[in-house]
Amino acid sequence: MAAGFLFHMGSLPAIATVGHKSKVLVIGGTGYLGKRLVTASLAAGHETYVLQRPEIGVDIEKIQLLLSFKKAGASLVSGSFNDYRSLVDAVKLVDVVICAVSGVHIRSHQILLQLKLVDAIKEAGNVKRFLPSEFGTDPATMENAMEPGRVTFDDKMVVRKAIEEAGIPFTYISANCFAGYFLGGLCQPGFILPSREQVTLLGDGNQKAVYVDEDDIARYTIKMIDDPRTLNKTVYIKPPKNVLSQREVVGIWEKYIGKELKKTTLSVEEFLAMMKEQDYAEQVGLTHYYHVCYEGCLTNFEIGDEAGEATKLYPEVGYTTVVEYMKRYV
């Protein structure tokens, strides 16, 4: 198994029968990826529930988003990580639980809150599949990650261990680089819009990474939830046309704007020195950039038979290529 832990099915229910559309609960449904998961679940015809957490308070944008989900056919369920019984009651309503709470320190790092959700799912006993908040780099491949960024991977592995020891059926999704964060800034940390003048290359700019449109991540995720081929496996989303280096991404942008950007380079030593000057949350994120852009951690291994790859499992799903994605910035 990709996660490296033994799996015991125990007394939990078997996977849904072929043709059955599971009832889905999305936790973190107002977040950057979560809102896309809700939309994709509804579009695929699943009875969809969204956890409405009181912690939202008077955040009008999130409240309006929840109301838009309700209008589109979703059911809102009150619940909180601070109220264990509410979690148990919420998961009892559905077959599949998808958690999309933030694992990004510059927003809010909530990965270990999922341990409460694991306990709730175990007690409820009806959940056929749990998809925890992963969606980035596969933490099982990052055992040698640097501090402080390794905390993200370590915490995700703690959650995986709890899931598997509880005998909860699962799917772990490694979606690599969110396109909005990486492509928009031409793979430069701290940028989300592409410059028309200059770009800083990380190292030689030739390390390959994998970029995935966030809407595609959501669509592939929903395809997996009733698929027995993805049960108790890690599934990578690795669109073949989207495995590109920073230089290749920059080249695509240069073709769109009809000019070459002024290029400077940032050596690994300069990057690490710059990283140490940032606060803790920034250092965590920059560590991830280091592993992706200097070490090529997303493409330096082969996907084994014990795992799966979404574009091969679902060739009927047309994914957004980097070339197509970049056009929106012109």
From Swiss-Prot:
Residues of the active site = K156
- Indicate the enzyme's highest-level EC class: oxidoreductase
Q: So what EC number does this one have? A: 1.23.1.2, 1.23.1.1
Reactions it catalyzes: (+)-lariciresinol + NADP(+) = (+)-pinoresinol + NADPH + H(+); (-)-secoisolariciresinol + NADP(+) = (+)-lariciresinol + NADPH + H(+)
What keywords does the record list, in alphabetical order? Answer: NADP, Oxidoreductase
A GO MF term: lariciresinol reductase activity
For binding substrate, which residues are annotated in this chain's numbering? Answer: H288
PANTHER family named among the record's database cross-references: NMRA-LIKE DOMAIN-CONTAINING PROTEIN, PINORESINOL REDUCTASE-RELATED
The family note in this entry says:
Belongs to the NmrA-type oxidoreductase family. Isoflavone reductase subfamily.
- Oligomeric state and partners? Dimer.
The protein, known as = Bifunctional pinoresinol-lariciresinol reductase 2
Taxon lineage: Eukaryota, Viridiplantae, Streptophyta, Embryophyta, Tracheophyta
